Amino acid sequence: MNLRPYQEQAADFLFERDRAMILAPVGAGKTAITLVAMRDALHHGIVNRFLVLAPKRVAESVWAAEAAKWSPTLKIAVAVGTPKQRLAAFNSVADVVVTNYDNLQSLPHLNFDGIVFDELTRLKNPSGARFKALHKLIDCKVRWGLTGSFTSNGLEDVFGQCKIIDQTLLGRSKGAFQQQYFVLVNKDFGEWAPRPGSLEKVMAVIKPATFVLTGQSSETQLHTVEVRCDMDMANYKTMKEEFVLEGIAAVNAAVVVGKLQQLASGFIYDTKVVAADTPGRFTTTQTPVWYSSHKFDRLDELLQENQHANTIIAYTYKEELAELKRRYPKAQTLDDAGVIERWNAGKVELLLVHPKSAGHGLNLQYGGSKIVFLSLPWSLELYEQTIGRLHRSGQTQDVWCYVMLTNKTVDERIWAALHDKRTVSDIAMGELC
């Protein structure tokens, strides 16, 4: 298989630099690009052996499969599984060893001079255990980072990602980085806000080490459709009033949003604390109480309107998953053995996914082109990554994303918040182009 012209440019960019990052929309082919660059670097003796760090599911199922397509001469070993299996992979003669980030703190003595960080945002926190373990163990001359969500959650994320690639880009100290580009807005909580123009300045600094693929590289279009539905608002309004009276919003906004989002989907968890058999011990039980089936009824109509075309349905809560399974007994999840292969073969009509498990690197573009968000994740990164399972290199049809929103509920605020966060990402990508 051959790379597209824009992908060849990205592969050349990596090959020509020891320290570099590829920023690309989800599905633009970052893995294929990197495999070709790795192959060339190994062939020319620039690197003797590569280590790839990736999210677990991607390490297990993506890199070896993609290597067979794009760089079949590469010897790939996957260091995932039991300690014995991981050690065997590290001790093999493979050109490339792929492992997951969770294994960082138990890595054996390393003999790699090249490293690839698949989904670089996993290392955005320079004070995190992953970052510290990696910084201590690995000193490779060639460091490449891949991500589709560089600044999804704000400018502060950029520092850690750049530091692990090249400390000369933004310096060694996050404190100095904050002092230069941010203003302290809340000393008690350590909250910082970017100074005017900081985003543009930071992106200009890191531009020489960064290759950006824009959404224009995709051959297919992404269409986003709001699917609106109504519910009886009596219970919803009552709950909002109770939260205000009890002052819960000021203490734990996440609890408020979670409860209201549940109710916008038609149910709520009744949480009770129950005394356990052991004195002084308590357990928490959650029983779903249903008030409305409006979203699921509208989902039925939507699937019928699309003539039951193969569709991914993204959910947030376990009770949503349970109801989906009740309504659609033949629906499958990512936990079902061989489901990815069956989906890509067009043999799965409904695939139920949680955004946290359907993120980085999964190739689902061959089995369908429609995705429904029954409820939305709060994270822009999770939202984009989930859509990117379909809207990626290799997709032959326009992708249709349906976002189900209950009118006059927190659904609308979550949807608006995702758009607000997107502004930061769009500015960053545009500045680097």
Q: Where does each model-flagged region fall?
A:
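Conserved helix-turn-beta segment of the N-terminal RecA-like "Helicase ATP-binding" lobe
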Residues: 58-82, 168
